[in-house]
Amino acid sequence: MMKKPVVIGLAVVVLAAVVAGGYWWYQSRQDNGLTLYGNVDIRTVNLSFRVGGRVESLAVDEGDAIKAGQVLGELDHKPYEIALMQAKAGVSVAQAQYDLMLAGYRDEEIAQAAAAVKQAQAAYDYAQNFYNRQQGLWKSRTISANDLENARSSRDQAQATLKSAQDKLRQYRSGNREQDIAQAKASLEQAQAQLAQAELNLQDSTLIAPSDGTLLTRAVEPGTVLNEGGTVFTVSLTRPVWVRAYVDERNLDQAQPGRKVLLYTDGRPDKPYHGQIGFVSPTAEFTPKTVETPDLRTDLVYRLRIVVTDADDALRQGMPVTVQFGDEAGHE
């Protein structure tokens, strides 16, 4: 008669254990089983020449894989090569002028300037003496007023020539003014800047891939005359691979930077990729229409960027991805 209560008691204990275990499993799934839905981020870049010109050649076509540093296309280099030659010549001229300013005047030039002063002084002395004689003759009415005026003009001209020669000799002996040297230096620096710009323009007439990727579109063909900045290629960036997902505020504490997650695609549901949350948006936004969970579409959510650590070529941009949080994914 005592066995029946014992059996009932054991049944109650077992039932309580089952309920407790189920509750624990449910809670663990709630805490560690967060599932989000996102897409592989679409990352493209438009490539263009920084300078304008005629397209000489294009080395790749749509669908080609490209590598960072690879030559993708070239403009006609000739105009930029000519501009570079002109810039080099400009630097040579400016450098020579600056060197002359620094060196000052040679002894031979100073001697020539001194001789010119002596010659101008002699001419002035003669003109002054002649003018003095003409004044005496004018007083005795031997010459006309016109003759006296001509003598005065000759004297004044000789005086101006003498002053110019004296100023030139003074400049030669004292060297070039600091302002003239500074101006020559500025002209040299300007010519050097023009040379650097010409070198850069020639370099930029070759289009180099900035990173690895896949060529999506080829917008022009050889022979096209482009303005600077005109799009030549559109490239899909393949590395790193990012997944964009959204989490609501209730689960935001689980989606912290550094948290590791598993990423599932329809093509390989049993073999997940591994990812790590790299960025959580600091501001909330309304859920984009691309999110596949209807319950979230009217909520305010936070955007996540998840870096795929073992990405391969099977992950295509725009592909839907299921993001699974849990102990098996691990924590940073």
Swiss-Prot record:
It comes from the Bacteria. Residues 1-16 form the signal peptide. Keywords: Coiled coil, Periplasm, Signal. One of its GO terms (cellular component) is periplasmic space. This is UPF0194 membrane protein YbhG. InterPro entries: CusB_D23, UPF0194_membrane_YbhG, UPF0194_transport. It comes from Escherichia coli O127:H6 (strain E2348/69 / EPEC). Disulfide bonds: none annotated. Its main location: periplasm. The keyword Coiled coil applies. Residues 108-209 form a coiled coil.
